[in-house]
Amino acid sequence: MKIAIVCYPTFGGSGVVATELGLELAKRGHEIHFITYSQPVRLALLNPNVHNHEVHVPEYPLFHYQPYELALSSKLVDMVKLYKIDVLHVHYAIPHAYAGYMAKQMLADEGIHIPMVTTLHGTDITLVGNHPFYKPAVSFSINKSDVVTSVSQSLKDDTYRLFDIKNEIDVIPNFIELNKDKLKENIPCHRSLMAPDNEKIITHISNFRKVKRIDDIVRIFFEIQKEVPSKLMMVGEGPEKEGAEQLCEQLGIQNKVIFFGNSNEIDKILCFSDLFLLPSETESFGLAAL
């Protein structure tokens, strides 16, 4: 099959899962086309079955915000026609499901009928999508999808509770590639680079958004380090990072906390760790913990 995958190209769980899914499908002989605004961070190498198409949004002074959704819809139409795509798989409802629906309608006017699968990942439903400004469009685009999946039963339940959804939602949990991890088992873990043997290493990995309760992680570590010699490794980028750095300074623990930024070498970081913290307010799946 020829499959177009629409996702965010960032380090967030939805983008990571979408990219890994595409790579696994490519290994099985399917032709995969990623369509997004930049190359996905987990798409290190392209192969004959994997293609990446960037969506370019022309700058125009009239627009206060550039119309990415329109550009994405048009790009989908072009790619479906050019590569004879069999199915669209859009990850994260906003704005991908709506853009996918618009593309379907434009293609239908030309006699091209293509099914669309929408995968719901979490905050596209429970936070952003539930906002009154977006809710009608999100509900509409989900109901217009040919197949809808969610990454957990709890997210499926939340979707039915928060939206007027008529479609059946299939639960397909997120995954990690175990064979890849087995290949990395022989990679040496240089823990001594992070902390001496008598110190414990606490780790947190996320997109540093409010729902992840970043300040609580710092405060939890503040109490831990009083009782146990330890260091905290904070991996990721996001709006709450600067506040967390300031809190570390206020508590006088800045020399015990390491902020890594985004990383593609999570396996190496986790091999250092004695404890992983994920005290999120809510998680639809929690891929980092898996």
Feature map (PLM): residue ranges:
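Nucleotide-sugar donor phosphate/pyrophosphate-binding loop at the beta->alpha transition
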Residues: 108-117, 123-141, 157
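Short acidic alpha-helix that forms the nucleotide-activated donor recognition element
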Residues: 264-273
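N-terminal strand-loop element at the rim of the active site
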Residues: 7-11, 23-68
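Aromatic "clamp/platform" in nucleotide-sugar-dependent glycosyltransferases that forms part
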Residues: 262, 281
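A short helix/loop element that forms part of the nucleotide-sugar donor recognition site in Leloir-type
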Residues: 181-196
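An amphipathic, basic-hydrophobic alpha-helix
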Residues: 61-88, 97-102, 132-136, 140, ...
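A conserved nucleotide-sugar
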Residues: 196-203, 214-259
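Carbohydrate-associated surface elements
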Residues: 154, 175
